Amino acid sequence: MDKNSTIIVLGTAHRMREPGKCSPDGRVKECVYSREIVSEVAAKLKALGYKAEVDFTDLDLPKSMQSPSVTLERNRELGMRVNFVNELCRQNGAKNVLYVSVHLNAAGADGKWHDAKGWQVHVSTTASQSSKLLANCLFDAAKSNGLKIRQPSFMQKYWPQSLYVLGNTKCPAVLTENLFQDNKDDVDYLLSEAGRHAIARLHVEGIMKYIEKA
């Protein structure tokens, strides 16, 4: 890909009004942590001369889009994200856009600590080869930055999953799960200076490597 014509879209995680999505002790809120990391990654990429956009920076939808129905509000949020990415694809050509949605994982939704830990990357069940290449580049960057890696098999680095933002965006798209917000060790690392730097750095390095290879 041509660095000068590539649009990198970084996706933030969820909303403050989305139930759960935090560590059992409340130290980590996924929507807040994700936005902090995305902001840092975008700033680093821009400083290196890349074009970076963020799909949704606010912590909640505008009042006019909020709803008593959790499902309806979530669907509105996801639709807004997909529309943002696809409009950039329409304006710039889908081959010149890539999408990386930055999340935290969870083993349960019960407010308890769990044993599962580590980093993983997801692609759509109908992912293109470009999406798989992007996932592989991020996987390699996570591994080189010392993160414990989770993969479905020794031969495959990415997890196929039916996720709305991956299946409905027109460009190469992946979703990263950056450790578990319900694992004590992972939370401690996420909140450490070294952990924050590693999470941000792996995204910068992985995206740069993909643009170089694609």
Where on the chain are the PLM-derived regions?
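Active-site-adjacent mobile loop/cap segments within catalytic or ligand-binding domains
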Residues: 6-9, 20-22, 108, 149-214
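Active-site-adjacent substrate-binding region
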Residues: 130-158
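Non-catalytic surface loops within mature trypsin-like serine protease
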Residues: 104, 125, 140, 180-182
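Solvent-exposed, polar/charged alpha-helical surfaces in well-ordered, non-transmembrane soluble domains
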Residues: 31-39, 43-47, 83, 132, ...
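Catalytic-core regions of hydrolytic enzymes
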Residues: 2-119, 125-129
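Short, low-complexity, polar/charged sequence segments that are solvent-exposed and flexible
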Residues: 28-29, 119-126, 139-143, 193-197
